[in-house]
Amino acid sequence: MQVSVETTQGLERRLTITVPAENVENEVKKRLQQLSKTQRIDGFRAGKVPASVINKRFGPAVRQEVAGEVMQRNFYEAIVSEKINPAGAPTFAPKALEAGKDLEFSATFEVYPEVEVQGLDKITVEKPAVTVTDEDLANMLETLRKQHADWAEVDTAAGENDRVTVDFVGTIDGEVFEGGKAEDFPLELGQGRMIPGFEDNIVGKKAGEEAIADVTFPDDYHAENLKGKAAQFTITVKKVEAQELPELSEEFATKFGVTEGGVDALKVEVKKNMTRELDQAVKANVKDQAIKGLLANNEIEVPKALVDQEVDALRQQAAQRFGGDAQNMPELPAELFHEQAVTRVKTGLLLGEVIKANEIKVDDAKVEALIATVASAYEDPTEVVEYYKANDQLMQQMRNVAMEEQAVEAILAKATVTDVETAFDDIMNPQQGA
């Protein structure tokens, strides 16, 4: 076998491989002989079909099949001998498939980039210094009360946080537009569900009264034909309802599985959950900063094959999030996921090099701690831990997470990390402060 390697562009490589004719011919001959023993052809007894007839009928297909296998086998032998690490599957192109001649073919593929992580000491991370305060706990209990509130119809004017039932008709230049009309539409005021300006004149109206809302659809509105358009909505208020919040009581506590200790026990349980979620959010925030710093200080080229694989994975995840099956849904454009896919591939390659450079081995204690953290959110943590340990796939996922966390810790050890006083809501609900 003769092998030559050339760099075509970027990470793309082309191997040109020549396989001696006898390697191909011997295998073709062997398979044709096997076929002659099993094929039934009119005019010949079973097992007595002449080689020339078998060759004429099956020779080209057998040669194609053998050539494919020979190319695969010799390609992998070549990359081992040449110490090449391909990223993705190769594309084979045989020069010719002529009997009695050497098989010459090319294999085009991408390789992994050579990565040398640098600039870790230039990374700066602001670690949120935050705890769950009494005010945070009170706000969370209020949120839980609102989530379990009842609604009672009232004769008063609609106010912020009230719920109204309305009919509305929207027009643009005096014409009703598609999707601009609804009847018996429930709307909780103050939640920001509608476009800016829609709710403003509903506040202060009673059932039976009418409001006019002059609005402009945002430039990034989902309906292409409405982006940036000025519209007017005529809104009829049909019903106004006010929230009736449940009292913080022993009965209320039982809604959350707290059967003993009443409100005090509920507060302890809620604060424990808030603290666990806060710890996870802080860790995610710090990790995100570390990864962004890693990417900013290390520009690397990524194999298109890996990006394409990541795009497919993201596309499938998107289909699952929308409750669909990726097989049966219209294919979402690759452009939607390309930027995220590139970032994920770069991150994976760089973290892999951090792991390699620091000779990081998976920490079993960290794996145990990760499983325990997941399990603590469930009613029976012991059962969840046992479930994980009995599932090889889940355990491997946890080992991967642990390795990634260890890599991030290695980055943070060289980065400049500063504690910054932060409010609970700024970490848990960052979009509200945006």
Swiss-Prot record:
SUPFAM superfamilies in the record: FKBP-like, Triger factor/SurA peptide-binding domain-like, Trigger factor ribosome-binding domain
Catalysed transformations (reactions): [protein]-peptidylproline (omega=180) = [protein]-peptidylproline (omega=0)
A GO biological process held by the record: protein unfolding
One Pfam family matching this protein: Trigger_N
MF (Gene Ontology): peptidyl-prolyl cis-trans isomerase activity; protein folding chaperone; ribosome binding
EC category name: isomerase
Gene3D superfamilies in the record: 3.10.50.40, Trigger factor ribosome-binding domain, Trigger factor, C-terminal domain
EC number: 5.2.1.8
Signal sequence region: none
Gene Ontology cellular-component annotations: cytoplasm
Domain PPIase FKBP-type: 161-246
Entry superkingdom: Bacteria
Keywords from the UniProt entry: Cell cycle, Cell division, Chaperone, Cytoplasm, Isomerase, Rotamase
Localization: Cytoplasm
Assigned protein family: Belongs to the FKBP-type PPIase family. Tig subfamily.
The record's note on its domains: Consists of 3 domains; the N-terminus binds the ribosome, the middle domain has PPIase activity, while the C-terminus has intrinsic chaperone activity on its own.
Function description: Involved in protein export. Acts as a chaperone by maintaining the newly synthesized protein in an open conformation. Functions as a peptidyl-prolyl cis-trans isomerase.
Protein name according to UniProt: Trigger factor
Species of origin: Pseudoalteromonas translucida (strain TAC 125)
Gene: tig
